[in-house]
Amino acid sequence: MTDESMSYQEKAYALLQADAEKIIQLIRVQMDHLTMPQCPLYEEVLDTQMFGLSREIDFAVRLGLIEAKEGKALLDRLERELSALHEAVTKKRVR
């Protein structure tokens, strides 16, 4: 799909997905290395990224570019990835 044929709604959602994917990559890097998620620097970066994405989503919803349920689905996916990281780290510590 070319830029000309994409609607503003499609562009907005694609940009939000790309930003969410960057956060997921950050989470996956942590999972791959099983670095402690309680690391203050990691927590601050992740919190900042999640907050920024939530504000982007809110803005897109308020403009009518995406549905609130689509934004919630993006954030829910990130929460699941984060839960998986915490579970993996917890399992590693138990061993």
From Swiss-Prot:
Signal sequence, renumbered to the chain: none
Pfam families in the record: DUF1507
UniProt record similarity statement: Belongs to the UPF0358 family.
Superkingdom of origin organism: Bacteria
Protein's name in the database: UPF0358 protein GTNG_0942
Classification via InterPro entries: UPF0358, UPF0358_sf
